[in-house]
């Protein structure tokens, strides 16, 4: 037997108001409020996705429309505090390209790509050698990027990770999709006063 659940016409008249409220609620999730909004399940989904992709570390970037940039709001690397202070402008670099096109991106020799903006690499003092970036949607819009990287290894450190492949990108895309559902559920639950979210 198929599961079938049709929209309830009684709620249709409230759809526009709910959509508007959802957009306003989504804009409240910023670098300053992310740690209060996010729960362990959300951050675990990201960490598991980065690990499954074979990344050295990963970052969730959320758009800051007022400043026209992407702000790092979550990172699971060794320099998490420094990373969460960083931003990337929306007018250059591959992460901004993914945000504007809505298309995922994967490259293993990224340091050779002239479109790669090395600003973050310089700020953390560790060159990126490979990157996956996928758009992150919630509240019906692309509002950020989920990215993960391989970093250049220092002499004498552990061997380089395997190259990113299509399975790596699927893992990061899956994590972003799960995170979308968690964000949307939490926002809608808070708006309608449902549950303990």
Predicted regions span which residues?
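Signal-transmission linkers at sensory-effector interfaces
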Residues: 1-40, 178, 182-197
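Amphipathic alpha-helical coiled-coil segments that mediate homodimerization
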Residues: 21-29, 37-56, 60, 94, ...
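Amphipathic alpha-helical "output/dimerization" segments
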Residues: 157-184, 190, 194
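GAF sensory/regulatory domain recognition
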Residues: 47, 59-83, 151
